[in-house]
From Swiss-Prot:
InterPro entries per the UniProt record, alphabetical: PCMT, SAM-dependent_MTases_sf
Enzyme Commission number, as recorded: 2.1.1.77
Organism: Shewanella pealeana (strain ATCC 700345 / ANG-SQ1)
Primary enzyme class: transferase
GO annotation terms (biological process): methylation; protein modification process; protein repair
GO annotations of cellular component type: cytoplasm
Compartments where found: Cytoplasm
Protein name: Protein-L-isoaspartate O-methyltransferase
Length: 211
């Protein structure tokens, strides 16, 4: 990163600490990730604001706080293999890839998937497998997963994703339509516990693929 972006990213990480993010590894990953590279140049001046921003195709790059919060939750069970549903700009994947050994990410919009792949390659993040496909279906052939993160709101918890969780695995997902809650589901054998983390607002998780 250039010095200005580096300072801005560090300031963003500090603001996330003040907002309640306590995992130092997550804060370092945010500070090391050039968020402006995941946006159109016209929005670059807003890159280090703690806000969601449009990335085209009706999608957004998530608010840095929620990126950090969901990552913090995922890391609680020290996952080796993580599935991300909704690659989007690739920013969340870039943060995760610095913190977990293996990341698999699925995106239904082809143009976004191509851009995200290029961005992560440019950042020399090579522990990420990309799939163009329907996020509702996950990526069964790569599973099971220690953790699954969904970056769009589902009307209900997709059964296909639950089935791809390893024993002890965690699914973090926003659920709801107009009003959404961030849920943490933990698998213990064939049983699941559910915990409400906080109220959130995400774009909807849409089924199918879009070229």
């Amino acid at each position: 990163m250039n010095p200005v972006a580096s300072t801005s990213a560090l300031n963003l990480a500090r603001s996330l600490y003040e907002a309640g993010i306590r995992n130092e590894a997550v804060l370092r990953a945010v500070a090391n990730t050039p968020r402006e590279q995941f946006l159109e140049p016209a929005l670059g001046h807003k890159a280090y604001e703690n806000t969601a921003l449009p990335i085209g195709q009706g999608q957004t790059i998530s608010q840095p706080y929620i990126v950090a919060r969901m990552t913090e939750i995922i890391l609680q069970n020290k996952p080796s293999k993580v599935l991300e549903i909704g690659t989007g700009s690739g920013y969340q994947a870039a943060v995760l890839a610095q913190l977990v050994p293996q990341l698999c990410t699925v995106e239904r919009i082809k143009s976004l998937q191509i851009q995200a792949r290029q961005r992560l390659k440019k950042l020399d993040l090579h522990n990420v497998a990309f799939k163009y496909g329907d996020g509702w279906q996950g990526w069964p052939s790569k599973g099971p997963y220690d953790a699954i993160m969904v970056t769009a709101a589902a009307s209900s918890v997709p059964e296909a994703l639950v089935a791809q969780l390893a024993d002890g695995g965690v699914l973090v997902i926003p659920v709801g339509e107009l009003s959404q809650q961030l849920l943490k589901l933990t698998r213990v054998g064939n049983q699941f516990t559910s915990e409400v983390i906080e109220n959130v607002r995400f774009v909807p998780l849409v089924s199918g693929e879009l070229a």
